[in-house]
Design a protein with these regions (language model features):
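Single conserved hydrophobic/aromatic residue that forms the stacking wall/gate
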Residues: 178-188
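Zn2+-dependent metallopeptidase catalytic core
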Residues: 68-87
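Acidic helix-start/capping segments at beta-turn-to-alpha-helix junctions
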Residues: 93-104
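Loop-centered beta-sheet repeat module
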Residues: 107-162
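N-terminal mature-domain "stem" immediately C-terminal to a signal peptide or N-terminal signal-anchor/transmembrane
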Residues: 1-41, 45
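Acidic/histidine-rich, surface-exposed loop or edge segments in extracytoplasmic proteins
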Residues: 49-64
Length: 188
């Protein structure tokens, strides 16, 4: 079932399978002989792992309702579209488990949010993450209050990367999320 769902999002699937859960190679996803013998069994093993079940349960409890986040992202995208005449009428948002590898990705024309990265600093799973990989200052940012700003920072880095620094991106993010009335009135 997971294999069938992920096939609809080939970029995310490749990232998830090969890099995030490190289950196998890219050709395992497209080679019919390897799908049945490698891919599906590895995905089943992953889904049935007791640790994964605990993490999935924690994600479900923390994010039992996600519509408010989608609404705020939609408003921000509308502001972005107004400022840049981008013609964005709808941002497709998806959520996934990143194996603690990614906060926000843009793959397959979808903005993907790794919910495991926002369980909260006080979450027992987050507390158990190794401090050499996840120092305390990083765990402090693993909070759902950062989802919206992380989505827009990632989106702006993808579409308006500035190698000279992120001051422009910070100004744009602030404008998209907090400007009222219209940003055009402010910047002409």
């Amino acid at each position: 079932q997971l294999h069938k769902s992920l096939r609809n999002y080939p970029e995310l699937y490749e990232n998830f399978y090969t890099r995030m859960i490190r289950a196998g190679e890219k050709d395992h996803l497209s080679n019919p002989n390897k799908i049945d013998s490698f891919t599906i069994p590895k995905l089943q093993h992953f889904l049935n792992d007791s640790s994964m079940k605990v993490i999935f349960k924690s994600i479900a409890a923390t994010f039992n309702e996600f519509d408010d986040y989608k609404e705020k992202i939609s408003v921000g995208m509308g502001n972005y579209s107004d400022i840049f005449n981008a013609g964005i009428t709808h941002a497709q948002i998806g959520t996934f488990y990143s194996n603690f590898n990614a906060t926000v990705l843009e793959n397959d024309h979808v903005i993907w949010i790794g919910l495991d990265m926002y369980l909260g600093n006080d979450n027992d799973i987050v507390k158990m993450l190794p401090p050499n990989t996840f120092p305390n200052y990083y765990k402090q940012k693993m909070d759902k209050k950062y989802i919206i700003s992380d989505v827009f920072f990632s989106f702006l880095m993808t579409h308006h990367f500035n190698p000279m620094g992120d001051e422009l991106l910070a100004r744009m993010l602030s404008c998209l999320l907090y400007t009222s009335p219209s940003p055009r009135d402010r910047y002409g």
